[in-house]
Amino acid sequence: MKFSKFFSNVQETPWYLDFLNPVINEITAYKKLLDFGTGTGKLIQILSTEKGTECIGVDTNSEMLLEAQKKLKGTKTKLFKIKPDANLPFKNNDFDYVTICSVLFHLKKNSVDYALIEAQRLLKDEGKIIILTPTGNGNFLTLSKNFFSFKNLSIYMWFYATRNRAKIWTNNNYLKHYANENKLNYKSQKVMNGFAQLEIITV
């Protein structure tokens, strides 16, 4: 099985919905949203069908986008393949939200800055960049206490695969420093019983 198909299946599990819910709850219905690093498209599938959000998803991975096309069949959501660190093909000040889930903590600093600068360009006044990232906090026991079920077995793979990079990202507070340096409003909260962090920058 290709990783893109495996990841698409993971996105259908109960724990993954728990992971995405904090982002979903931040989105006002019938707004326009860009999902940066959309992967196989679960977030924008939910938002387009449940909140009437006008969604565009972008990703660098063709196989992920092929899986997203299957998931998004029958919706008006649009998908674009992009090159790393290239300007996005959208006009300035056109989106209410830019969402970035489980992406930035994998990237080098220059790529993180690129994503944030592009997000600022694309957002309307008072638009929001919403970033969701695993924290790397917790352990096998706390994970089992909160999420154990046979449908959630993939959460253990997710936790151990992301833990080291996630801890570094969480401890560095990069987005908080970025927002302060650029005089942007920033807030954050731990979500998903402390296993993830939601960070919001308002431009």
Regions found by a protein language model. Give the residues of each.
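Conserved class I S-adenosyl-L-methionine
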Residues: 1-28, 30-39, 42
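Class I SAM-dependent methyltransferase SAM/SAH-binding core
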Residues: 40-86
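Short conserved loop adjoining the S-adenosyl-L-methionine
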Residues: 87-92
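A conserved beta-strand element that flanks and buttresses the S-adenosyl-L-methionine
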Residues: 99
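A short glycine-rich, Lys/Arg-flanked "PGG" loop and its adjoining helix->strand segment in the class I
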Residues: 113-125
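Conserved beta-strand signature within the Rossmann-like core of class I S-adenosyl-L-methionine
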Residues: 127-134
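C-terminal alpha-helical "lid/dimerization" subdomain adjacent to the S-adenosyl-L-methionine
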Residues: 134-178
